[in-house]
From Swiss-Prot:
Role summary: Involved in mRNA export coupled transcription activation by association with both the AMEX and the SAGA complexes. The SAGA complex is a multiprotein complex that activates transcription by remodeling chromatin and mediating histone acetylation and deubiquitination. Within the SAGA complex, participates in a subcomplex that specifically deubiquitinates histone H2B. The SAGA complex is recruited to specific gene promoters by activators, where it is required for transcription. Required for nuclear receptor-mediated transactivation.
Name this protein carries in UniProt: Enhancer of yellow 2 transcription factor
GO biological process, one term: mRNA export from nucleus
Subcellular localization: Nucleus, Nucleoplasm; Cytoplasm
Keywords: Activator, Chromatin regulator, Cytoplasm, mRNA transport, Nucleus, Protein transport, Transcription, Transcription regulation, Translocation, Transport
Annotated HAMAP family: ENY2_Sus1
Cellular component annotations (GO), alphabetically ordered: cytoplasm; DUBm complex; nuclear pore; nucleoplasm; SAGA complex; transcription export complex 2
Coiled coil spans: none
Subunit structure: Component of the nuclear pore complex (NPC)-associated AMEX complex (anchoring and mRNA export complex), composed of at least e(y)2 and xmas-2. Component of the SAGA transcription coactivator-HAT complexes, at least composed of Ada2b, e(y)2, Pcaf/Gcn5, Taf10 and Nipped-A/Trrap. Within the SAGA complex, e(y)2, Sgf11, and not/nonstop form an additional subcomplex of SAGA called the DUB module (deubiquitination module). Component of the THO complex, composed of at least e(y)2, HPR1, THO2, THOC5, THOC6 and THOC7. Interacts with e(y)1. Interacts with su(Hw) (via zinc fingers).
InterPro entries registered for this protein in UniProt: TF_ENY2, TF_EnY2_sf
Organism: Drosophila pseudoobscura pseudoobscura (Fruit fly)
Similarity comment text for this entry: Belongs to the ENY2 family.
Pfam families noted in UniProt: EnY2
One MF annotation (Gene Ontology) recorded for this entry: chromatin insulator sequence binding
Amino acid sequence: MTIFNAVDKFTMMSGDRVKIKDLLSSRLTECGWRDEVRLLCRSILQEKGAISSFTVEQLVTEVTPRARSLVPDAVKKELLIKIRTIFDENEADDIDPEEA
């Protein structure tokens, strides 16, 4: 199991996945990332305008690497800190007071 899969499974089971997604969504909106990606999509669609068979899947494939690179480091760092905090809180909850 990869770290990504472990984090995904843990956050889903703990109920924190929604909190993390909400935090990410709000931060990406605040920093203008969503607007940048929207403009990027428009640009690609205009570029490919003559190709009527250009699919949504192809657009996603082309946009995804660029969109990921546009996520500000501060947002990535804040998300990582939030995930670590959730894990730390879970570890603290798992400690048996009689064993400590």
